[in-house]
């Protein structure tokens, strides 16, 4: 087996084509967990952009074939043998989401005095705060804690640990995060130490972990993952919540909102609010 040379695949086109292609990536059996982003690149011209980062020759070929089937201009570049993700994100501006201010070391000299400042460095884990889904979760959580506090919080698919850390920094007595990716769990633990947050992180597929089970039920569950896992985990999330508990769902495109929502409404959940940011949706629902 030969080593794969990292590539960045870029596809540009109209919003409908880009969103439909992104939805197809999510539902492609050979691209489960594929790393990509979708955003509006040029508002005036209505140009949307997908950036995909395959990790194998097979994933590369599948992405090129899939994206080539849409009315999109597709190109690709070879990435340098470096920590390209950190390089790409190191100059990103800080993000403000409600009371939360998410920043990297390069912005440590200009922190607002009236915000909850969370330092999250660029790296291999998802969730620096810049993605529309992460911002949506923070905005939704900020709105919720204006009315109440959540004592026990679970973050499914924690990535960098940002959401669990945000909960720990705003009054949660227990904040637990899970991730299927072991390096992400390590990064989450490091971020909790940096941010002086009493948050715990464990390696788990979904909610399948002893620590998660022992501390259930939770007042609030974050699940910022992908549409299909959100649907498949609906019953597990319901069991993990107290009656009347809240779940914040994200990682889904607007085009996937209806099917994700249906999985929870069929289990008695009620929609509290929803947030749209770029092509992404965040749903806040309450357990019966």
Swiss-Prot record:
Reaction catalysis annotation: L-lysyl-[protein] + 3 S-adenosyl-L-methionine = N(6),N(6),N(6)-trimethyl-L-lysyl-[protein] + 3 S-adenosyl-L-homocysteine + 3 H(+)
GO MF term set: protein-lysine N-methyltransferase activity
Official protein name in the record: Ribosomal protein L11 methyltransferase
Keyword vocabulary terms for this entry: Cytoplasm, Methyltransferase, S-adenosyl-L-methionine, Transferase
Covalent S-S links between cysteines: none
Keyword Repeat applies: no
Localization terms from the record: Cytoplasm
Primary residence: cytoplasm
Pfam entry (one): PrmA
